[in-house]
UniProtKB/Swiss-Prot annotation:
Record field: catalytic activity: 3-dehydroquinate = 3-dehydroshikimate + H2O
Lineage: Bacteria, Bacillati, Bacillota, Clostridia, Thermoanaerobacterales
Gene: aroQ
Residue pairs linked by disulfide bridges in the UniProt entry: none
Pfam families cross-referenced by the UniProt entry: DHquinase_II (PF01220)
A GO biological-process term: aromatic amino acid family biosynthetic process
Subunit structure: Homododecamer.
Pathway: Metabolic intermediate biosynthesis; chorismate biosynthesis; chorismate from D-erythrose 4-phosphate and phosphoenolpyruvate: step 3/7
InterPro entries: DHquinase_II, DHquinase_II_CS, DHquinase_II_sf
Identification of the protein by name: 3-dehydroquinate dehydratase
E.C. code: 4.2.1.10
Protein keywords: Amino-acid biosynthesis, Aromatic amino acid biosynthesis, Lyase
Stated family: Belongs to the type-II 3-dehydroquinase family.
Binding-site list for substrate: 73, 79, 86, 100-101, 110
Length: 150
């Protein structure tokens, strides 16, 4: 089984940016923890980060036939990127949306995700552990043959 982890904009600044909100772990730390869990689960993992909406869309478009599921933190694009929403809907793979913080407990403009309605599920508010939960969820969805929304 192969899983793609997509990290959206500004996540490359984790560990330096708003540490009171996002914590001290870096993106490299998160990727290392994900790789460790993936090894335990027998999963081949690819991690990709971009600040570019177009690059994230291109990687999603390339996912079918190369991966079985996607764990995706769309970050700031969560709330308004119809293009990413449409890409998630188009790929025909289980996509688990993850967020470090509880987007529903933050500023009102962060409460709405345009990605969630086309994702298999959403995990938010558990910090970096949310990525690990997202990977476990993706593996479970693939194992059960779930392609998209329940």
């Amino acid at each position: 089984m192969r899983v793609l982890v997509l990290h959206g904009p500004n996540l490359n600044l984790l560990g330096r940016r708003e540490t009171g909100i996002y914590g001290n772990e870096t993106l490299a730390d998160i990727d290392a923890r994900l790789q460790e869990l993936a090894s335990e689960l027998g999963v081949d993992l690819e991690c990709f980060q971009s600040n570019s909406e177009a690059a994230l869309i291109e990687r999603l478009h390339g996912a079918p036939g190369t991966v079985d599921a996607v764990v995706f933190n769309p970050a700031g694009f969560t709330h308004y990127s119809i293009a990413l929403r449409d890409a998630v809907a188009a790929v025909g793979l289980p996509v688990v949306e993850v967020h470090l913080t509880n987007i529903h407990a933050r500023e009102e403009f962060r409460h709405r995700s345009v990605i969630a309605p086309v994702a298999a599920g959403q995990i938010s508010g558990f910090g970096t552990a949310g990525y690990l939960l997202g990977l476990r969820a993706a593996v479970e969805l693939v194992s059960r043959g779930k392609m998209s929304r329940a």
